[in-house]
């Protein structure tokens, strides 16, 4: 018995020793773990510091690059202005008409130069000089177009404006004088919906013709107009008659109130024609096609509409009767992928999803604190992303009826209102443009912030993914478009191309279904077609009397492509293009 007790005691002692050894080992491991974690945190902090330093250096380098590029552009503009002044003096002479005889010497006229200078000052607050732009032509009425590349800049003449040739310099001068006449006749610009608390002075929905800041220069222009020589009076009378014809709603002929200009330095088969003119009761803030291309949705004050693309007839109208006082502009409309629902975002800070067939509200999403400016559906129809003036973008889960993610915080989120949002074709990414000049990218499935794209000099008002999802286009108040490369590593944002050519704010951008065209709408009242592969503009369309606030292309191309424009002139227009 005694031996057994001793044996048990010995075993217990051995077990206790092993437990003590294990505890000692465990404490060593814990100590090593703490040491490793401390080292890891220190290295992570150092890495973050290095990354932040690199980011600051890159941002500083980009700012210096932008500054130097701007200085170079200013010097180029000074040189171009000398050529422009010479060509403008030639514009005021009889040599602007076709003639087989030698042109007479140009007659210099100080009054005409004053008109040009005053108009340039009114239309360009930053003293930017006019760039050389493609030569405009009148839309064809059935005959094939024959565009020639020539060093002299000659182009074909179309019926509608008489014997006078049009190039962009003449067209710009004509437009400036037409705008003066319209302002004199109207007495004040078109009132656009208020966008407080965003920067209302610069928002596209308030892009009317502001008279207060230009009254003195307008008076100077009026005095100069009264002193023009006989030839200018004849040309001005022709323009008045042309403006009168353009303002009449009845008896319009194809091409009587819209112009197309083609770039003489490139060969293109691009042709444009007007399909339907869709009159509205207020500013058209947004346009959007259904996925099958059969319907177009528009948003204006207090209502959203759906039109049949083939006939141009209104087939549905959606009005929220709960809000009956004051204005309620529909800032954004978007079809669900199956075409059964229409999402709308408005000044009431809510996202509404309408059943198109019953015209009833299916869902209402609350959560934004300010006006909603942009919406987009995911490709599977399960989510909607919205952008608001509250500096946030939100992803809404339609099935669960709640917000899945809020994109944006004090550290990496927008510093000002979100003006535009877009979902990538595969539904994995969300892009947002903001008034702080930056485009941001998030993971739509996790809500994690991925990247920021800097380079614009002013607020970003529109973003759009390319059909293959490898590029992102942005349009800005700095009058430019940028194309960002998403195909490689996102550790460094890379601007693939910058598109310059608009003379005022770029308010909307969109890709064609095959990605071969990038189109943009601007406050300068024009739509431009760009080749995203080389940054070349092929065509400029002038088909509205006020800012082109929204552009959209039909996802389906049959015999020809279709695109839509929405404008401050109370009209949306459907166009077809062949390329």
Curated annotation (Swiss-Prot):
Residues 227-256 have a biased composition (Basic and acidic residues). InterPro entries: G-protein_beta_WD-40_rep (IPR020472), Tscrpt_rep_Tup1_N (IPR013890), WD40/YVTN_repeat-like_dom_sf (IPR015943), WD40_repeat_CS (IPR019775), WD40_repeat_dom_sf (IPR036322), WD40_rpt (IPR001680). Its main location: nucleus. Belongs to the WD repeat TUP1 family. Transmembrane segments: none annotated. WD repeats lie at residues 279-319, 325-364, 367-406, 413-452, 455-494, 501-540, 543-579. SMART domains: WD40 (SM00320). The keyword Protease does not apply. Acts as a component of the trfA-tupA corepressor complex which is involved in the repression of many genes in a wide variety of physiological processes. May also be involved in the derepression of at least some target genes. The complex is recruited to target genes by interaction with DNA-bound transcriptional repressors. Associates with trfA to form the trfA-tupA corepressor complex. Residues 83-101 have a biased composition (Polar residues). It is found in: Nucleus. This is General transcriptional corepressor tupA. Residues 109-128, 157-198, 207-224 have a biased composition (Low complexity). One of its GO terms (cellular component) is nucleus. SUPFAM superfamilies: WD40 repeat-like (SSF50978). Keywords: Nucleus, Repeat, Repressor, Transcription, Transcription regulation, WD repeat. Residues 83-258 are annotated as: Disordered.
